[in-house]
């Protein structure tokens, strides 16, 4: 028995054939699938590049519940950890794509990965990581550190 496939089109013109059941993890794709004319010609995803869409599809295929190929929770956690071993720019692109496509599990995984990266860093390191300019005066910063002394211990 063959499974129904749909075509997803990235912002840079790449097309990907995906099993409909795996694609159903993306809420925006479900909305497009209800409009039959979109599925016939492919579903355009103007906010996702081909490189990132390929990764999203890989994630959805792995997380798709497939009775024929069950995956234990431990195996899936290990796979997720290895999947997120990417440069920070790619992780941020995955966060944006997961948010746009409304894939909560991928969004949560990518955000948790960023949280683990910055965990234990100083405020200065976190500002540098996110490219945030420090707009506090030295006096304001000192007052905040005094008020929240427990957080800096």
UniProtKB/Swiss-Prot annotation:
SUPFAM superfamilies: POZ domain, Skp1 dimerisation domain-like
Stretches for region Interaction with the F-box domain of F-box proteins: 95-153
GO cellular component, one term: SCF ubiquitin ligase complex
InterPro entries linked: SKP1, SKP1-like, SKP1-like_dim_sf, SKP1/BTB/POZ_sf, Skp1_comp_dimer, Skp1_comp_POZ
Pathway involvement of the protein, from the record: Protein modification; protein ubiquitination
Main localization (coarse): nucleus
GO BP, sorted A to Z: auxin-activated signaling pathway; jasmonic acid mediated signaling pathway; protein ubiquitination; regulation of mitotic cell cycle; response to auxin; response to jasmonic acid; ubiquitin-dependent protein catabolic process
Entry's localization field: Nucleus
Residue ranges crossing the lipid bilayer per the database entry: none
Signal peptide: none
Top-rank taxon: Eukaryota
Pfam families: Skp1, Skp1_POZ
Tissue expression remark: Expressed in leaves, shoot apical meristem (SAM), roots, flowers and pollen.
This protein's UniProt keywords: Nucleus, Ubl conjugation pathway
Physiological role: Involved in ubiquitination and subsequent proteasomal degradation of target proteins. Together with CUL1, RBX1 and a F-box protein, it forms a SCF E3 ubiquitin ligase complex. The functional specificity of this complex depends on the type of F-box protein. In the SCF complex, it serves as an adapter that links the F-box protein to CUL1.
Subunit and interaction comment: Part of a SCF (SKP1-cullin-F-box) protein ligase complex. Interacts with CPR1/CPR30 and At3g61590.
PANTHER family: SKP1 (PTHR11165)
Similarity annotation: Belongs to the SKP1 family.
The protein's name: SKP1-like protein 9
Gene designation per UniProt: ASK9
